[in-house]
Design a protein with these regions (language model features):
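Catalytic beta/alpha-barrel core
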Residues: 9-16, 38-47, 62-72, 126
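Conserved, mostly hydrophobic/aromatic
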Residues: 54, 131, 197
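Alpha-helix-loop-beta-strand connector modules within alpha/beta enzyme cores
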Residues: 18-45, 49-59, 149-168
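Active-site-adjacent beta->alpha loops and helix N-cap segments on the catalytic face
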Residues: 16-27, 45-53, 70-82, 99-108, ...
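Active-site-adjacent loop and "lid" segments of alpha/beta metabolic enzymes
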Residues: 20, 58, 62, 72-77, ...
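Glycine-rich, proline-tolerant flexible connector loops at the mouths of alpha/beta enzymes
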Residues: 2-39, 98, 135-143
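Conserved anion-binding
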Residues: 71-138
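Active-site loops and adjacent core secondary-structure elements that bind or stabilize anionic groups
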Residues: 157, 163, 174-256
């Protein structure tokens, strides 16, 4: 909160915890702190009973993270109706019965289908629908992963042009998993990605606000290489990034 978060994402999924009980207890503690309670909350769980219990604890408008078409239309609509009944907005993952949408074509197919189901069958308020078209890991050395960031950005633009009032979000840390151990480079990659995704219409992102890097502060050489990787501009972009990565390993992170 003190580092500038505008919404709090709360997750209690852990094999060692009773997630439903812990979520309820933790939300009640949060509600007792005025500094924390003033922010909107996002309830994050893979178990719908945990989400449902959490929404019953929240007084203001919450966001559910997340539902998908993974288990089919009937389960999706049933749960979305309950979310609406409890007054929350909804993040919808680009995931259906066939699996996670990784390409641009699959992302817009799944998001378009989910939007139509929600708005036509449930009359779910479109301004309360937030799509997560899957931010996936790039710079892995595998050619099939090269366009993942660009496909997310393109899907974001398509959603804003074709699904009226819907929003777009995503978990940005997924993008840079291939750079684990090089925190500055990871955060610089996130900054470049967000710069382009926001221009395409991205509305919100799950990030660590205490370690963010400012786009304008990224060295020109690194910025060019990161944009080549994210926008898929060169076949050798990943190799060029790896070649300069070590020189940024000790670069300090500063809170913004």
């Amino acid at each position: 909160v003190r580092d500038g978060a505008m919404m709090l994402d709360i997750n209690m999924d852990d094999a060692m915890l009773d997630a439903k009980e812990e979520m309820t207890h933790f939300l009640n503690l949060m509600a007792s702190d005025p500094e924390v309670a003033r922010l909107p909350w996002m309830v994050d769980s893979s178990r719908f009973e945990v989400i449902e219990a959490a929404l019953k604890c929240i007084q203001g408008k919450a966001v559910v993270n997340s539902l998908s078409l993974k288990e089919g239309e009937e389960v999706f609509l049933q749960r979305a109706a309950r979310v609406r009944e409890l007054g929350a907005a909804l993040i919808v993952m680009a995931f259906d019965e066939e699996g996670q949408a990784t390409s641009y074509e699959r992302k817009i197919e799944v998001c378009g289908r989910a939007y139509r189901l929600l708005t036509e069958k449930l009359h779910f308020p479109p301004q309360d629908i937030i799509f997560d078209p899957n931010i996936l890991t790039i710079a892995t050395g595998m050619k099939e992963h090269d366009a993942y960031a660009l496909d997310f950005i393109r899907a974001t633009q398509w959603i804003h042009e074709n699904l009226p009032h819907a929003k777009v979000s995503g978990g940005v840390s997924n993008l840079s998993f291939a750079l684990r151990g090089n925190n500055y480079l990871r955060e610089a990659m996130h900054a470049v990605f967000l710069y382009h995704a926001i221009k395409a219409g991205m509305d919100m992102a799950i990030v660590n606000p205490s370690t963010a890097v400012i786009y304008a502060d990224i060295p020109k050489e690194l910025l060019e290489v990161l944009e080549d990787v994210i926008l898929c501009r060169r076949a050798d972009a990943t190799e060029r990034l790896i070649a300069i990565a070590e020189s940024y390993r000790e670069q300090p992170l500063q809170a913004v």
